[in-house]
Structures are given as C-alpha cells and as structure tokens.
Regions:
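Short acidic, hydrophobic short linear motifs in intrinsically disordered regions
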Residues: 28-40
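Short amphipathic alpha-helical interaction segments
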Residues: 42-57
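Interdomain "pre-motor" coupling segment immediately N-terminal to P-loop NTPase/helicase cores
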Residues: 53-118
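Dynamic helix-loop-helix/coil hinge segments at AAA+ ATPase domain boundaries and subdomain interfaces
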Residues: 111-139, 362, 379-380
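Conserved ASCE/P-loop NTPase catalytic core
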Residues: 130-317
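A short helix-turn-beta junction within AAA+ P-loop NTPase domains corresponding to the substrate/partner-engaging
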Residues: 327-342
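Conserved AAA+ ATPase small/helical "lid" subdomain
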Residues: 353-415
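C-terminal engagement/docking regions of AAA+ P-loop ATPases
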Residues: 410-484
C-alpha cells in the first residue's frame, strides 16, 4: 500500500503547491472545517494545518467558528485578501480535489503493481472460463497469451464471442490496485482516476487510539491520494480516434485528462472492432509501436514538453475482419499472440443451446438443433455462430408470448423464431446471411472450437521479414511460443 505521508516532503508537493490547493478549495467550496479540507485534499490534517497557520499569519485565511475540539474542527474561510490570492491560483489551473501525486511516484506504483506480476494456471483458466463452451486446445493458446501481459489479437467471424472472451479475461485476472486521483507533471495536473473505468473498493482503516487533535479524522492505512480499485478494464471500439491517445487539455480549467491507455495501466485494454475505427489500423499501430515494445508511452503537454508514462496493460485487439486486410505481416509480428476464434462445431453448438435453455427454464431437445441445422444452416448455407442459440431462444420466447403458448422447442415455434432472425437468402452465408448480432458481454455461452485458421496458412506462406520472428504464434492450434 502507498504509505501515508508523514511530512510535506513525503507528499512530493512544494509548500506553495499545497497552499494554492488549500486556497482554491476554500474559493470553490466556501468555508470548510479542517476535517472537510482533509477529506477533499486527502493528506493528513497535520500537514494541511501547517499551511493554514501560515495563511492565517499572512491574513489570507481566518477562523469563522469551531465544531468540537482541536483545529480539525475549526471552520476556515478566505479573507478579502485571500480571495484575491485564490483567484491568482485559479488562473494557474482550476483543479480542486485530492492532492496530485508526483509523476515519479506514479511510475513507481505502476511498476510495483505491474500486470506482468499476474499469472494464470491451467486449472485457474479452466475455472475462469467455465461459464463458456471452449475447446481445451483453445485454452492452451489463451493461457500463455494472458501470462505474457503483452498484446493479443482475437480474430474470426462476428458472433463467436471475441468481445465476451476479452471481457472474461479481464474478469478472470481479478485483483485490485492503487490508482492516484491525479498526477503532477512539472506543475501541471493530469487527472487519472475515472469512475467509468476504475471501480472503487472500500477504504481500509487502521485500528488504534486517536489523539485529541485528530479525533475527527479517520485513520487510513494508505495514502488517500490513491484510490483502491478493482483491476481496470478499459474498453473502446469504433469511436476511437488518434487524438484520444493523447492528453486531453481543457483550456478553461487548464487541467489535463489522462488518455484511456494510461487509465488502463495495471489492467486490460480492449480495442474492439479493430479496423472499423475512424483511424486507419496502420496509423493506430504506428502510434503504439514504441509503447508495445518498450512498455513506455510519451505524452505531450500543450507547452510542447514531452514526458514518459508507463504502458502497462494487457492489450487485446478484437476484429471480425481478415487481419491481412488490415495490416501487413510486419505489423502483425508486433502483436505477440494471434488467436483465431472459429465458429462452433455442432457438438459445441448443442452444448451452448442446452445451457441457454437451462437458463431460460426450457426443456432442451437435441432434435431442435437438428431441425435448425436442416432447415436453416443447411438450406440457406448460413454458418452457425456461437451467439445464435441465445438469440434463437430469445426469439422463440418472444414468439411464444405472441401466440399465447409455453416456450417449448417444437417445430412451429422454432420456425417462427428462426424466420425472423435468419435472413432467407439462398445464396447467403457471410455476415448478412448469418443474421448475427453482437455477442452480449453477459451472454451465457459464447464458444469457440478448433477449426482451421486461414491466417495461420497465410502467415506460413508469407516471405520472411527483416524483423525478428514473432515472439509467439497461437493460430489454429496450441500456442508455439518462441519467446526468450
């Protein structure tokens, strides 16, 4: 845990930086007690009180009242002179909140909590993915990719659970870590904590007696400028643009927002629908060549100053496009693990269908799957997808309610369900004929099987490049790692 700072030097803040933060807090929030200032700034009151005493002597702050014993219960407010000084501080930046953590300390704690320290065993991955129908050989590919803490490419036709797999990987890794609310970069504030991506866990406390001075202040076991959160999972899709990979500067508040790859440090970063972004895949990978190899990214302040930040996440690309149509082999080698997510076999399809029926309290019959294969997959040339069982059963339940019937797997209900789901295109196949919708992240049974992988054949025939061999290949079978 990040230790509680005992001195101002321990915080990494200069005396004037803390003074400015106290003044801005009083300016924005109005009169506050010492305890309320501590709750906002998140450093021990004793350190804040040293600055309050100085501000009182300089006639910037005055005491308006008291609640309880000790200065922690005093109510502090700005004087007229103090408001002028606070406005000067606001001109620098308008950040009010937990005191920023120095960039060096942030780097230190990213390294201490690195995703490289997370590993999964065969038994652990079987338990973690027990809610999915997966070929055991597929787990042999997935496990090493997770343990690498590098980059992973999940590709295959839509509807086979790539997005679900990526999110399941993140959930399976579990754990928690400490993320600073904000980081100080040469006097500039970069806000890092994001409630969208960082799920707070309860704050810990240390048992023990309290002195009269800090009786109002809860005793915490760690530096409260850090938030204790679940391992972050940052998800982005087709809306991604190149400028989102850089610092987002608000010219009004003069505060920076960290880009999403920084918010993902210590966790999982998922780029869904890779190749469908408004930015070209080549441009995106060009932007990340150095971070992928060096595990370090470089961001730029609006002043032009560049600074390094850790790039420490398991990066997962997911796409239903042909990888060789997106980027050339040289770029694919930069992504360490390439894992093909194929359509389910009929046996896997039956297992998925059975699980969906159980979850909907419907009696399962193998004959129902045989009927769908004969009347739709076979007749229309539509390839089965892992999301189909869930969607077909949902349609069947909807149709049963419409005709005032119990949802059972009988021909006329299956016909009504499938007719409104699959596109009746005799020359079908492909994405349109499949009638596929996006796999729900909480769906019970997306699945994969060990079918042939087209990229494996294409890569095996590709001419050798000047770059070193890909550190790992996980296509069409168990991973063959050549990682040193």
């Amino acid at each position: 845990m990040p230790p509680v700072p005992e001195t101002l030097e321990d915080t990494g803040l200069s005396p004037e930086a803390l003074v400015d933060l106290v003044l801005k807090t009083l300016y924005v929030q109005g009169a506050r007690t010492g305890q309320q200032l501590t709750d906002t700034i998140r450093i021990p009151f004793a350190l804040i009180d040293d600055r309050l005493l100085d501000l009182q002597q300089r006639q910037f702050v005055e005491v308006r009242g008291a609640k309880g014993h000790g200065r922690g219960g005093y109510t502090f407010d700005l004087t007229g002179k103090g408001r002028e000084r606070a406005r000067e501080a606001m001109d620098s930046n308008q950040y009010v909140g937990p005191a920023p953590v120095p960039l060096t300390k942030y780097r230190e704690w990213v390294e201490r909590q690195s995703i490289k320290g997370v590993s999964v065993s065969r038994e652990g991955i079987e338990v973690g993915f027990s809610h999915l129908v997966l070929d055991p050989k597929f787990l042999d590919q997935l496990g090493p990719a997770i343990n690498s803490a590098k980059s992973m490419f999940l590709y295959g036709d839509s509807g086979n659970g790539k997005t679900n797999l990526a999110e399941s990987i993140a959930r399976m890794m579990g754990g928690d870590l400490f993320v600073p609310h904000a980081v100080d970069v040469d006097g500039h504030v970069m806000v890092l904590f994001d409630p969208v991506h960082h799920r707070l866990l309860p704050e810990g406390r240390v048992n023990g007696s309290k002195s009269e001075e800090d009786w109002l202040e809860p005793v915490h076991a760690y530096d409260r400028r850090f938030a204790r959160v679940q391992r972050p999972v940052v998800f982005t899709g087709g809306e991604l643009t190149l400028d989102q990979l850089d610092l987002q500067y608000d010219s009004h508040s003069k505060v920076y927002q960290a880009p999403f790859q920084v918010k993902a440090n210590g966790g999982v970063l998922i780029i869904d629908d890779f190749g469908r972004q408004r930015v070209r895949p080549r441009d995106l990978l060009n932007r990340w060549i150095v971070p992928l190899e060096k595990r370090m990214d470089y961001l730029t302040l609006h002043t032009g100053h560049k600074f390094p930040v850790p790039f420490d996440s398991l990066l997962i690309f997911a796409t239903n496009l042909d990888p060789l149509d997106l980027v050339d082999e040289a770029f694919l080698r930069r992504i360490h693990y390439k894992i093909f997510v194929p359509s389910p076999t009929k046996e896997e399809y039956q297992k998925i269908f059975r699980r969906v029926c159980v979850s909907r309290q419907i009696v399962y019959r193998n004959e129902a799957v045989d009927w769908i294969y004969e009347h739709f997959y076979g007749r229309l040339g539509i390839p089965p997808r892992s999301c189909h069982p869930r969607d077909v059963v949902d349609h069947l339940c909807d149709y049963a309610r419409f005709v005032d019937s119990e949802p059972v797997l009988v021909d006329h209900l299956l016909q009504g369900a499938c007719a409104s789901y699959f596109l009746d295109m005799p020359d079908g196949g492909g994405e349109v004929g499949a009638g596929v919708v996006a796999a729900d992240a909480n769906a019970d049974e997306p699945a994969e099987s060990g079918l042939d992988d087209p990229l494996a054949t294409a890569l095996s025939r590709a001419p050798s490049e000047s770059e070193p061999e890909s550190t790992a290949s996980a296509v069409g079978g168990p991973a063959e790692s050549t990682e040193p």
